[in-house]
Amino acid sequence: MPPRELSEAEPPPLPASTPPPRRRSAPPELGIKCVLVGDGAVGKSSLIVSYTCNGYPARYRPTALDTFSVQVLVDGAPVRIELWDTAGQEDFDRLRSLCYPDTDVFLACFSVVQPSSFQNITEKWLPEIRTHNPQAPVLLVGTQADLRDDVNVLIQLDQGGREGPVPQPQAQGLAEKIRACCYLECSALTQKNLKEVFDSAILSAIEHKARLEKKLNAKGVRTLSRCRWKKFFCFV
């Protein structure tokens, strides 16, 4: 009998003694919860939509509470980040606080062309965060950076008797004062520094989770050691 020809798509048969190749199991997906807080109309929703959907909202719509989910790869491992878009209005204070527990990282957002939103970082948002979640890392984020040099915006600020845009050194100084992981300015419209903001949030959350796990493991070892010492002491 002539030998059977093998097509290009058909692999050669394995010898009977050769075990089938094992498939490598995919690494488990790490979950991260990221909550955005800040005054209303500073652009929190726009940041999330621009990052997850590569789009920009046509008009402002106040948000009560929305969640978005996107998967990214960090050093080849899958990471699922849940983005929580919260309302900045006082009417939603109670609802907003419900999403703070178990948060891995916070983005404290203010508009660089709304000085009052910058002031509220220390007067409202940071105290609110620390009341419900004292340990999670916080990133200070200046939004609407594309408007910093916008002539119409500058005229409106001047005519309204308000201060000019928040200076970058002042924002950087606040980040150091409140011990934020970093200060970043970005624009949802132009997407400038947008990826850097969420990349920094993801890495900060991963590092925070690793520190918590290390502390938990160390605590378990100490507890186990004490139990063994007590048993040994009683036996003797």
Swiss-Prot record:
Binding site for GTP: 38-45, 85-89, 143-146
Signal sequence range: none
InterPro entries: P-loop_NTPase, Small_GTP-bd, Small_GTPase, Small_GTPase_Rho
Membrane topology qualifier: Lipid-anchor
Tagged with keyword Lipoprotein: yes
UniProt feature, compositional bias: Pro residues: 10-20
UniProt entry keywords in alphabetical sequence: Cell membrane, Endosome, GTP-binding, Lipoprotein, Magnesium, Membrane, Metal-binding, Nucleotide-binding, Palmitate, Phosphoprotein
Residues lipid-modified (S-palmitoyl cysteine): C234
Compartments in which it is found: Cell membrane; Endosome membrane
Record GO terms (molecular function): GTP binding; GTPase activity; metal ion binding
Entry-annotated residues carrying Phosphoserine: S25
Essential cofactor(s): Mg(2+)
Residue segments, region Disordered: 1-27
SMART domains attached to this UniProt entry: RAB, RAS, RHO
Protein family: Belongs to the small GTPase superfamily. Rho family.
Subunit structure: Interacts with PAK2.
General function of this protein: Plays a role in the control of the actin cytoskeleton via activation of the JNK pathway.
Protein name per its UniProtKB record: Rho-related GTP-binding protein RhoV
Source organism: Mus musculus
Gene from which the chain derives: Rhov
